[in-house]
Amino acid sequence: MAKFFALKNFTALSDLHPNMANLKIIGIVIGKTDVKGFPDRKNIGSERYTFSFTIRDSPNHFVNVSSWGSEDYIRSLSDNFKVGECVIIENPLIQRKETEREERFSPATPSNYKLLLSENHSMVKVCSPYEVDTKLLSLIHLPVKESRDYYSLADIVANGHSLDGRIINVLAAVRSVGEPKYFTTSDRRKGQRCEVKLFDETEPSFTMTCWDNESILLAQSWMARETVIFASDVRINFNKFQNCMAATVISKTIITVNPDTPEANILLNFIRENKETSIADEIDSYLKESVNLNTIVNVYTVEQLKGKALENEGKVDPFYGILYAYISTLNIDDETTKVVRNRCSSCGYIVNDASNTCTICSKDSSRSRSFCLSFDVLVDLTDHTGTLRSCSLSGSVAEETLGCTINEFLTMTSEQKTKLKWQLLLERSKIYLKLILSHRARGGLKVTILSCKLADPIEASRDLAGQGHT
């Protein structure tokens, strides 16, 4: 039989005071930062390393724990445990917390104290979940903020710039978790980022970005349209590149996964009830960019877009623009060209035709996946200055452009498809575009069509005349 660690044998976080010695504390890790190095003022030319984490031993009590020391010690200690695990801390130093200064960058805690670990005197031991009281383990599903203290995603979008820079709480479901992307900054520091798409009853897609390894590691364990999170103290900003509001995980953030609250249970029920009935809508909103077209105002020619792409070389963020152009290639009546594809209901990516599996979700092959048909058309766009080749026209944008649904298209004869093609070819259109540099894309530029409608001749002449073109 497993040996249980009884809470009564440890000092409770609620009982902490500075004069205590030979402490032994048990708690569950609810937050953790990355290891960082800083110049050592006492030893010029060397560095000291640090990381911090937050532990909890009851619903109302949690504290921040910091450790400083050599790189080997700090990295070894940090690698020893992760968020969600239970730890025993022996002989920490209790310090009074400087609330205003410290909580600018650390999670806000109800305690007046913080714990400091010494390389020579303190010890941290990881407990097996079988050795821990279930009351302690259940704390991982309890948000650190009041369960109703959050913004809905629609409220964030509606408030827009008034929330720019604010730190708030968010309750949402996970729509998709992107692959971590790694980069090197101009001063040769290595970095990483991971985009998580969220949704709730009010908003189909909202971006949250993780920049640190610990939050990225946590996010990789989340299941699309099954996981609900309560993210306390995320920063909200207006993303000028994507023209929308977005959230960022910061050092103050604590994320509670599948919170045990009435509000989270309502959201979870919403997910389950809509999971099978709205697959088509779910897929479509993956393909739709969450960009307000009214915020895209810059008009370009093809030549100018290619020039701007060269100016942006080395940048990962997309740019947006309006193009007055003709669809010069539209192979929707060619039997050898596939324009309708299956997309995964979990992540929105194209399903491999040969294996009939999603390459993104294949790591969890034990789960059954639903697929949905979607337009996936590559078109060429041409104006008087040149041609953008292999531009992506997909989802509902494709349906609106073609003037038919997937099902209507699939019932068309080859002659009807050819007639539809010639109705669209060589008609000047007003096209909203998202462009991003990509070495995988043809010409090094990935172009996504956000909207494509027949241009008003007067509007087109006016806009192009403003650039010296007609």
Swiss-Prot record:
Protein's cellular compartments: Cytoplasm; Nucleus; Chromosome
Positions of the DNA-binding region: 167-272
Any Pfam family the entry gives: OB_MEIOB_N
Disulfide pattern: none
Annotated GO CC locations: chromosome; cytoplasm; nucleus
SUPFAM superfamilies: Nucleic acid-binding proteins
Keyword Nuclease: yes
Single GO biological process annotation from the record: female meiosis I
Alphabetized UniProt keyword annotations: Chromosome, Cytoplasm, DNA-binding, Exonuclease, Hydrolase, Meiosis, Nuclease, Nucleus
Class of enzymatic activity (EC top level): hydrolase
Superkingdom classification of source: Eukaryota
EC number of the protein: 3.1.-.-
GO molecular function, one term: single-stranded DNA 3'-5' DNA exonuclease activity
The protein's role, per its UniProt record: Single-stranded DNA-binding protein required for homologous recombination in meiosis I. Required for double strand breaks (DSBs) repair and crossover formation and promotion of faithful and complete synapsis. Not required for the initial loading of recombinases but required to maintain a proper number of RAD51 and DMC1 foci after the zygotene stage. May act by ensuring the stabilization of recombinases, which is required for successful homology search and meiotic recombination. Displays Single-stranded DNA 3'-5' exonuclease activity in vitro.
PANTHER family documented for this protein: CELL DIVISION CONTROL PROTEIN 24 OB DOMAIN-CONTAINING PROTEIN-RELATED (PTHR21166:SF2)
Protein family membership: Belongs to the MEIOB family.
Record's subunit section: Component of a multiprotein complex with RPA2 and SPATA22. Interacts with SPATA22. Interacts with the complex BRME1:HSF2BP:BRCA2.
Protein name as it appears in the record: Meiosis-specific with OB domain-containing protein
